[in-house]
Amino acid sequence: MIIPALDIINGDAVRLYQGKYQSQSHYGNPYSILSTYVQQGATMIHLVDLDGARNPKNRQLSLIKELTHTAITSHLKIQIGGGIRHATDIKTLLKFGVNRVILGSIAITHPKKVKQWFTYFNPSSLVLALDIYIDSKNNRKVVIHGWQKETNIQLEEVIENYNSVGLKHVLCTDISKDGTLLGSNINLYQSICYKWPKISFQASGGVAKLTEILQLRSSGVNSIIIGRSFLEKKFTLTEAISCWQNASSRV
């Protein structure tokens, strides 16, 4: 599945370069962008509240509720992240009609609490978002708090930990690629899809060419999240969906 990304700051659709808030590109009204994605065949939207991600007190809940309603009216599924800190945050979003809630830094800083969420909520409604930095020794270290803090926790360690409580969806981003149009880390996705075949992996970061969609699908990922390439009209969602459908999946 191809999932277009919609990142929001102060009610505006934006993209960050490598997660830096000071490196923003603005693309205007999120409703008109959402409408374009609907027209081009979207079946799911990836929405991130970047204000909420930076400070949970600034979550754009009214906007999220309206965008979710618009998505549902258009028969779109929606997954949302940004500033999720409590079980009540998840309940609120699911009540809005959100299909999946994305859990980022909180899953690393408070694993005991988040593992309880996996037993309380349907694991299919939760997405574990792991941003990783790959060092010179090819260690895949998890980065948290909007990519501001590198941990010594390995990607594989986190997946294995949450796999024990029914983990279904993992969104994995190589932060050196995100928002750069520099291409995807195909080897990363090949290895994790091979190791955990029952988990649905979402690839994110750097997709700049339609040919990468072919490579990513053959790597075994369940879906690809694409943001900047659509917003800057490198190719259309319609073209990306067609490319995905024509690709031969590793199954």
UniProtKB/Swiss-Prot annotation:
GO terms under biological process: L-histidine biosynthetic process; L-tryptophan biosynthetic process
Top-rank lineage group of the source organism: Bacteria
GO CC, alphabetical: cytoplasm
Catalysis performed (reactions): 1-(5-phospho-beta-D-ribosyl)-5-[(5-phospho-beta-D-ribosylamino)methylideneamino]imidazole-4-carboxamide = 5-[(5-phospho-1-deoxy-D-ribulos-1-ylimino)methylamino]-1-(5-phospho-beta-D-ribosyl)imidazole-4-carboxamide
Main location: cytoplasm
CDD domains reported for this sequence: HisA (cd04732)
Presence of keyword Isomerase: yes
GO molecular function, one term: 1-(5-phosphoribosyl)-5-[(5-phosphoribosylamino)methylideneamino]imidazole-4-carboxamide isomerase activity
Pathway: Amino-acid biosynthesis; L-histidine biosynthesis; L-histidine from 5-phospho-alpha-D-ribose 1-diphosphate: step 4/9
Keywords, alphabetical: Amino-acid biosynthesis, Cytoplasm, Histidine biosynthesis, Isomerase
EC number annotated for this UniProt entry: 5.3.1.16
Cellular localization per UniProt: Cytoplasm
InterPro entries referenced in this protein's UniProt entry, alphabetically: Aldolase_TIM, His_biosynth, HisA_bact_arch, Isoase_HisA-like, Isoase_HisA-like_bact, RibuloseP-bd_barrel
Residues annotated as the enzyme's active site: 7, 131
Similarity comment: family membership: Belongs to the HisA/HisF family.
HAMAP family, per database record: HisA
Protein name (Swiss-Prot/TrEMBL): 1-(5-phosphoribosyl)-5-[(5-phosphoribosylamino)methylideneamino] imidazole-4-carboxamide isomerase
Organism: Blochmanniella floridana
